[in-house]
């Protein structure tokens, strides 16, 4: 994580000067201007390799919205969460002398998340996304709040953010921990050490932030944590998908798949199916493994263009929604045209449905991979004996491990069940909608854990099939075979597979291996959108 001190990049100097300062310090810069952040920028921000710089024009819009907000308060208007309570307390108005205390304590009342803290990279994303959505200029908070979030980023300072406690209609229980830490309450991470927030800020050269009216609500009433979790999980899903496409292609080549279905998809399929058909045809030809001698392929081979295309469509669609949400203002109230208005923008239903859709599409991909594993091991394909046990060899072979494939698929399928429709009403009936976005993302992340293992198992089975058939694949299939053989010797007798499968899974899920597999058989637009090649 970058250890830049806050004064170097406070976001308060001119944008161009701040970028030049970043370059002079030997780091890059990501400009936060209230516009969507792509996956390359998100990855650099999460890793702390680039400084975050506030665009001055965007900051001026924040200041203008703040002026309009203060004018509304000065007129005597009641403004939700500023001079009134929140939730079921919306009709309560604190006295003028209690207003400062009310705002200071508001973040504490909402700092109730529990569970294992989020990783530093994801927490950094939450800070960056909250700052960026403020910079759209509709929040009504002080410019200093956006500056302070960016100062934390550039100091390598992150709040300890426990992730359980959001209904997905503004992550108040999660982001409340951010607001509390900014004020000096709670814990923070600095240089890998968990410290009391006050001590961490002192070491980083920062002072506690005193929330002005609306600053407390702006700090906590945001889906920034859910969007951060979403971008991280969807970005990971893109890599896992590319790995599963590679292992699926290798398994298909080992099974002697026929070229006709991919060619048919290039002409008769949807645009995405046609693209995937071309991808399969090219990668399959590059493998230099001859097709089988049969009339018809089983569906798990024949329908790969359709299954792969659906997964690519779903994951890319989720990624595009997530990127848009890195700039979408989800505050309530909001400032529009100088007026303070109530808003329902804190319901990220489009993103939640996109995440759930991606998980469901990946469940279909999991079934497809499991079925290919079964197909190869069953011994019904010419040249591939039962359990991949070569004649004259004393082995049980790969039959038993198919039970692992079955459970991994079942886990993914179970996690693909939607959670966003769960009914719930809180806050004395005022809050009767929910998306459970963080829970939906957690399901996707756990599904990806299972999918990484399933990809490893399919790769191991494909490699064994190549070996028993005496085939030496080239191209993408050859990359998969080589990746397996770096970690697991060919099977000459039965042995424990647990550690091998886990090691192969870790290798195939590594950024470097994902980039290598993608370069061997590019899916150019998809790979560029998700910055897959940046992983190398």
Predicted regions and their residues:
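Short alpha-helical scaffolding segments that buttress acidic/His motifs in well-ordered protein cores
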Residues: 42, 106, 110, 122, ...
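FAD-binding glycine-rich core of flavoenzymes that anchor FAD
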Residues: 137-166
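FAD-binding core of FAD-dependent oxidoreductases
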Residues: 80-105, 109-134, 160-183, 193, ...
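Acidic, glycine-rich active-site loops and adjacent beta-strand->loop/helix elements
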Residues: 86, 112-113, 132-133, 153, ...
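Conserved SET/PR-domain catalytic core that frames the SAM/AdoMet-binding pocket
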Residues: 76-78
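C-terminal auxiliary extensions adjacent to catalytic cores
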Residues: 3-50, 54-61, 65-73, 99, ...
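Short secondary-structure transition/capping motifs
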Residues: 54, 58, 91, 95, ...
């Amino acid at each position: 994580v970058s250890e830049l001190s806050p004064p170097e990049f406070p976001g308060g100097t001119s944008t161009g000067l701040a970028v030049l300062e970043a370059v002079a310090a030997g780091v890059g810069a990501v400009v936060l201007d209230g516009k969507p952040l792509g996956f390359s920028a998100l990855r650099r921000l999460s890793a702390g390799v680039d400084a975050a710089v506030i665009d001055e024009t965007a900051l001026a819009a924040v200041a203008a919205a703040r002026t309009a907000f203060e004018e509304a308060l000065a007129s005597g208007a009641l403004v939700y969460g500023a001079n009134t309570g929140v939730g079921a307390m919306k009709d309560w108005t604190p006295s003028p002398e209690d207003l400062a205390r009310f705002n200071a304590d508001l973040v504490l009342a909402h700092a109730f998340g529990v569970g294992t803290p989020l990783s530093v990279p994801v927490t950094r994303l939450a800070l960056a996304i909250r700052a960026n959505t403020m910079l759209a200029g509709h929040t009504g908070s002080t410019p200093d709040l956006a500056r302070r979030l960016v100062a934390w980023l550039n100091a390598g300072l992150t709040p300890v953010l426990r992730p359980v406690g959001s209904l997905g209609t503004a992550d108040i229980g999660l982001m409340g921990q951010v607001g509390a830490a900014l004020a000096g309450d709670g814990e923070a991470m600095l240089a890998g050490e968990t410290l009391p927030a006050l001590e961490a800020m002192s070491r980083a050269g920062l002072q506690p932030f005193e929330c002005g009216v609306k600053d407390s609500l702006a700090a906590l009433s945001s889906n920034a944590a859910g969007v951060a979790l979403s971008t991280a999980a969807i970005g990971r899903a893109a890599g896992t998908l590319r790995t599963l496409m590679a292992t699926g292609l290798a398994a298909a080549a080992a099974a002697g798949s026929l070229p006709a279905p991919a060619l048919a998809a290039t002409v008769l399929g949807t645009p995405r199916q046609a693209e995937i058909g071309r991808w399969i045809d090219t990668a399959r030809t590059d493998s230099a493994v001859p097709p089988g001698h049969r009339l018809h392929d089983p569906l798990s081979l024949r329908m790969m263009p359709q299954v792969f295309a659906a997964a690519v469509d779903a994951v890319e669609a989720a990624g595009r929604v997530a990127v848009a949400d890195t700039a979408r203002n989800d505050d309530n109230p909001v400032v529009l045209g100088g007026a303070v208005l109530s808003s329902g923008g804190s319901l990220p239903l489009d993103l939640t449905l996109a995440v759930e859709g991606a998980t469901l599409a990946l469940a279909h991909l999991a079934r497809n991979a499991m079925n290919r594993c079964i197909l190869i091991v069953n011994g019904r394909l010419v040249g591939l004996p039962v359990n991949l046990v070569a004649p004259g060899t004393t082995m049980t072979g790969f039959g038993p491990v198919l039970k692992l494939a079955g459970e991994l698929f079942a886990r993914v399928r179970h996690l693909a069940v939607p959670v966003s429709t769960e009914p719930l009403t809180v806050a004395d009936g005022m809050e009767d909608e929910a998306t459970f976005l963080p829970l939906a993302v957690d399901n996707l992340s756990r599904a990806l854990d299972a999918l990484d293992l399933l990809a490893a198992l399919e790769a191991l089975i494909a490699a064994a099939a190549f070996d028993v058939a005496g085939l030496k694949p080239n191209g993408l299939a050859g990359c998969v075979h080589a990746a397996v053989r770096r970690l697991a010797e060919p099977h000459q007798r039965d042995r424990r597979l647990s550690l091998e499968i886990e090691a192969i899974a870790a290798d195939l899920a590594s950024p470097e291996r994902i980039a290598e597999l993608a370069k061997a058989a590019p899916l150019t637009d998809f790979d560029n959108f998700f910055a897959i090649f940046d992983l190398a």
